[in-house]
Amino acid sequence: MAKRDYYEVLGVAKNASDEDLKKAYRKLAMKYHPDRNPDSKEAEEKFKEAKEAYEVLGDEQKRAAYDRYGHAGVDPNAAGMGGGMGGGMGGGMGGGMGGGFADAFGDIFGEIFGAGRRGGGGPQVYRGADLKYALEITLEQAASGFDTEIRVPSWENCDTCHGSGAKAGTSPKTCRTCGGSGAVRMQQGFFSVQQTCPTCHGTGKEITDPCPSCDGVGRTRRNKTLQVKIPAGIDDGMRIRSSGNGEPGINGGPPGDLYVEIHIKQHKIFQRDGDDLHCELTIPFTTAALGGELQVPTLGGKAEISIPEGTQSGKTFRLRAKGIRGVRGSYPGDLYCHVVVETPVRLSDEQKAILRQFEASLNDGGDRHSPQSKSWTDRVKEFFS
């Protein structure tokens, strides 16, 4: 899951002062502190998130890197991208092992085997951040699938400076600290360790005259419109991955991905269970007693169902293949209709008199008309005997 924007986490504007940041952090820390919420995992996560955001935005250098490159600019693991061992070794050790380890041992192996480092002569490359978008759809849309258009907030390259961060008519200058490599070397004992340049933060460039549209960041926050295909049968909580539609990479790095998370609205009639559907079938007590034909709703229209005489509440009727065909399913699920016998209300005196006559006729017939009631009465008598 992609990290939230640090300014959004603290609830402050991008131009917030140090004092505003401090106040916002203190407020959140007081609210979500584990001592105040000992049994809340959510509060613990929010406390950690606020702490992480303030540790970056409360530091002038880290904040500048974050404003320019987003999360990648303050991620210590991102520095390893673009490193690696080539030449006589023929293999790669970049990225996953981390910059410090790969750089230190890369120099040793280079001296022994004559291997040259690839990627060490240019600025650090960062993959763009992934984006997450929550999409709410209906059960009918989930069953049939559809194409839709969404607007996703994202950092995009500035249209004015085309991502350079420099004012029109100027260009970034080579970083004086690292000479344009985006990295500096530090001697630690026998090892020569390469680290991201603290001045240019891995870009290899310095901006002396920043672009007024993006304040030298090279990127602006805006909504981008994307087409998304929702497959038929998708279920609540599933995610659709749109490769390359996340935030753009930095220094030529690959873009991130977009993850669309599906949330299905509660339906007025149906409840979904996998590929099956369930609904309540409310019938009058006369139909339950005498039987009859009823029409029941399905996602594909109406269906006929036969109600046998003497149907009781709780009986379930199964309509095969009237459910949903799942994303990977070969056949649709079933529809289960659960009977609820409705007792009439607000009866007239005449209707009540008819029912009393009906009740008397049932009593004359003994227990054969109400076997379940007789069984329940016998169990109650046994309980109290």
From Swiss-Prot:
SUPFAM superfamilies: Chaperone J-domain, DnaJ/Hsp40 cysteine-rich domain, HSP40/DnaJ peptide-binding domain. Its cofactor is Zn(2+). Zn(2+) 1 binds at C158, C161, C211, C214. It is found in: Cytoplasm. Its main location: cytoplasm. Gene3D superfamilies: DnaJ domain (1.10.287.110), Heat shock protein DnaJ, cysteine-rich domain (2.10.230.10), Urease metallochaperone UreE, N-terminal domain (2.60.260.20). Zn(2+) 2 binds at C175, C178, C197, C200. InterPro entries: DnaJ, DnaJ_C, DnaJ_domain, DnaJ_domain_CS, HSP40/DnaJ_pept-bd, HSP_DnaJ_Cys-rich_dom, HSP_DnaJ_Cys-rich_dom_sf, J_dom_sf. A zinc finger (CR-type) spans 145-223. This is Chaperone protein DnaJ. It comes from Bordetella pertussis (strain Tohama I / ATCC BAA-589 / NCTC 13251). The gene is dnaJ.
